[in-house]
């Protein structure tokens, strides 16, 4: 258990750990990923609280600072995955061509637009939704990664990370984390049903994205997981900001 938690923090954050993340990524690390997400959620919630205290409730600057800290704390890994995935989905050709675009590493117009829109929406939604909602949104993003690695989901050809994590998560693990984050979302909004509904909707949208990527690329990659995380976080943040 300790090694899985250590691996989750090494994989998902900039925190120094005894073992390199690349040597530990697997079933246990993915199962523990929402725990690392909870730590990131606490960090993000704290930054938003401090920013709101300094600049006023609903300040866009507080939201921007929160997003910036999350980017630094995760090395920008997930937003880079979103960029590469959107560029790959935007190209024509067979799966091999799309995967080549994904692995090229050069941000195209689709990817740049997706990153800009995501960061803008997250910043504004975080500012409006409050610190508790930010915590839920960040954790939900990590739960989406667990769900994307459930059994039956293949890895794309040539994907190192995809081969390590695809199909490693029993469905009950993904379901358990989903129920946990949905339950935690109950007191976040004035309407008790809103939080769980938003979490379910965000995870459903993520599942749809992953399913489309499996059809387009033949399976998942590390970039697809990053895209699923960012999409889930963004949708959850927006939904929880609705009054």
UniProtKB/Swiss-Prot annotation:
<comment type="pathway">
    <text>Cofactor biosynthesis; adenosylcobalamin biosynthesis; adenosylcobalamin from cob(II)yrinate a,c-diamide: step 7/7.</text>
</comment>
<feature type="transmembrane region" description="Helical">
    <location>
        <begin position="29"/>
        <end position="49"/>
    </location>
</feature>
<dbReference type="Pfam" id="PF02654">
    <property type="entry name" value="CobS"/>
</dbReference>
<keyword id="KW-1133">Transmembrane helix</keyword>
<feature type="transmembrane region" description="Helical">
    <location>
        <begin position="119"/>
        <end position="139"/>
    </location>
</feature>
<keyword id="KW-0472">Membrane</keyword>
<feature type="transmembrane region" description="Helical">
    <location>
        <begin position="170"/>
        <end position="190"/>
    </location>
</feature>
<keyword id="KW-0812">Transmembrane</keyword>
<dbReference type="GO" id="GO:0005886">
    <property type="term" value="C:plasma membrane"/>
</dbReference>
<dbReference type="GO" id="GO:0009236">
    <property type="term" value="P:cobalamin biosynthetic process"/>
</dbReference>
<feature type="transmembrane region" description="Helical">
    <location>
        <begin position="222"/>
        <end position="242"/>
    </location>
</feature>
<feature type="transmembrane region" description="Helical">
    <location>
        <begin position="194"/>
        <end position="214"/>
    </location>
</feature>
<dbReference type="InterPro" id="IPR003805">
    <property type="entry name" value="CobS"/>
</dbReference>
<comment type="similarity">
    <text>Belongs to the CobS family.</text>
</comment>
<dbReference type="GO" id="GO:0051073">
    <property type="term" value="F:adenosylcobinamide-GDP ribazoletransferase activity"/>
</dbReference>
<keyword id="KW-0808">Transferase</keyword>
<dbReference type="GO" id="GO:0008818">
    <property type="term" value="F:cobalamin 5'-phosphate synthase activity"/>
</dbReference>
<keyword id="KW-0169">Cobalamin biosynthesis</keyword>
<feature type="transmembrane region" description="Helical">
    <location>
        <begin position="53"/>
        <end position="73"/>
    </location>
</feature>
<keyword id="KW-1003">Cell membrane</keyword>
<protein>
    <recommendedName>
        <fullName>Adenosylcobinamide-GDP ribazoletransferase</fullName>
        <ecNumber>2.7.8.26</ecNumber>
    </recommendedName>
</protein>
<keyword id="KW-0460">Magnesium</keyword>
<comment type="function">
    <text>Joins adenosylcobinamide-GDP and alpha-ribazole to generate adenosylcobalamin (Ado-cobalamin). Also synthesizes adenosylcobalamin 5'-phosphate from adenosylcobinamide-GDP and alpha-ribazole 5'-phosphate.</text>
</comment>
